[in-house]
Amino acid sequence: MCIRDSIGLYRNEQTYEPVEYLCKLPKTKNKTVLVLDPMLATGNSSSAAIDLIKERGVKVKNIKLVSLLAAPEGIKNLRKNHKDLHIFTCSLDKGLNKKKYIVPGLGDAGDRYMGT
């Protein structure tokens, strides 16, 4: 059975750090948890989400991160903070620009999703 719950984070554009606005997670200690991050840039938001999941007793070996597009910086950050994390991405781009967006990238995933 699949249980879907949510962690809502957005990036503070001045500090580039994640800000949590929603956390609705069940206790799923022995389940596999998929973290979906469409564009893995700095890895800060994904790392914060994984920390919240780990606080609920889930072991890193049971967490899988899935992204469409990733930057090397984000993968490095996740590896540093969550050594045994499984990371799956469709494509690895060059890196990040000054605003910490993936280049060449696809733009802002949240803006695209929300149509803004």
Name the predicted role of every residue range.
Residues R4-T116:
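PRPP-associated nucleotide enzymes
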